[in-house]
């Protein structure tokens, strides 16, 4: 059985940890409010751009823009993975990394063995994980969420489109956590390039479902749809990836707040258990001392 001193030391350690987790929960809650607002505000704009692009795609020959044209054969694939920079956010990174591994090691197993699956990792956790295991990470952004801005999304899109247009990859996937609620995010894996028109029965992400709720309008375009579509495609890609980063950031803060709340509750329960153990040990020590005193007194009486 642990000594009173050892139990006191452990109680002090747990109290210190509890203060830390409680503070982290409060910080995550404050960040979540800002991140959630940014993510939700980005959804309508991204949805409207997608609606316009779908409308235009039905009026023109999509072969005018290579980013709209599927390749006849997919020989090389690029995976854009979005994780967090920091830990202590529950299963946030674990689940999304597992999804990426399944896509690469199962769906594209043959390509992966031949080194024909490339990765762009946004976030330190995913970047470190896949680099250490020998995956073909061509670009990494390990501190992207320290100062998240639109230029970060534009840079990733530029790298992805360069690889696609040069023929180095024939398909681009994006995998990320989409903010759903405070309890759990949506794990999303979708095709980023080539840009495909939205399907009527596509369940997809919350953002995709929001897009379905927007009525399709038969627009009159000026100048020509062909000119507009070439201007709209890069804006659409930049906006969609920016939304992905915002969604992931909001989901990360929600996961961290939930994880720290759970850790604080666990620390509280552990303190209660340690207090009971300490009181029992203290009572046992006092009882032992009393017995020793009584035993000593009896011995003195007998010797007298």
From Swiss-Prot:
Membrane topology: Peripheral membrane protein
Record's protein name: ATP synthase gamma chain
Quaternary data: F-type ATPases have 2 components, CF(1) - the catalytic core - and CF(0) - the membrane proton channel. CF(1) has five subunits: alpha(3), beta(3), gamma(1), delta(1), epsilon(1). CF(0) has three main subunits: a, b and c.
Keyword Ion transport found: yes
UniProt keyword Nucleotide-binding, yes or no: no
Keyword line: ATP synthesis, Cell membrane, CF(1), Hydrogen ion transport, Ion transport, Membrane, Transport
Pfam family, one: ATP-synt
The organism of origin for this protein: Chloroherpeton thalassium (strain ATCC 35110 / GB-78)
């Amino acid at each position: 059985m642990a000594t009173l001193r050892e139990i006191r030391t452990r109680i002090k350690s747990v109290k210190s940890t509890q203060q830390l987790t409680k503070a982290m929960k409060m910080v995550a809650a404050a960040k979540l409010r800002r991140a959630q607002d940014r993510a939700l505000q980005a959804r309508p704009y991204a949805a409207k751009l997608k609606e316009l692009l779908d409308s235009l795609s039905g009026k023109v020959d999509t072969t005018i823009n290579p980013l709209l044209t599927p390749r006849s054969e997919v020989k090389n694939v690029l995976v854009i993975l979005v994780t967090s920079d920091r830990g202590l956010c529950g299963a946030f990174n674990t689940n999304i990394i597992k999804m990426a591994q399944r896509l690469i090691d199962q769906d594209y197993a043959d390509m992966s063995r031949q080194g024909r699956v490339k990765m762009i990792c946004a976030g330190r956790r995913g970047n470190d994980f896949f680099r250490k295991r020998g995956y073909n990470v061509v670009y990494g952004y390990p501190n992207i969420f320290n100062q998240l801005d639109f230029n970060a999304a534009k840079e990733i899109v530029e790298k992805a489109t360069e690889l696609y247009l040069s023929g180095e990859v024939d398909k681009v996937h994006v995998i990320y956590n989409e903010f759903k609620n405070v309890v759990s995010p949506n794990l999303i894996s979708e095709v980023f390039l080539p840009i495909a028109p939205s399907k009527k029965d596509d369940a997809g992400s919350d953002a995709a479902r929001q897009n379905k709720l927007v009525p399709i309008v038969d627009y009159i375009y000026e100048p020509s749809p062909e000119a507009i579509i070439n201007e709209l495609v890069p804006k659409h890609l930049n906006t969609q990836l920016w939304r992905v980063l915002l969604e992931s950031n909001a989901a990360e803060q929600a996961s961290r707040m939930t994880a720290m709340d759970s850790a604080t509750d666990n620390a509280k329960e552990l303190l209660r258990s340690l207090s009971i153990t300490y009181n029992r040990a203290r009572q046992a020590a006092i009882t032992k001392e009393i017995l020793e005193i009584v035993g000593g007194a009896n011995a003195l009486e007998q010797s007298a």
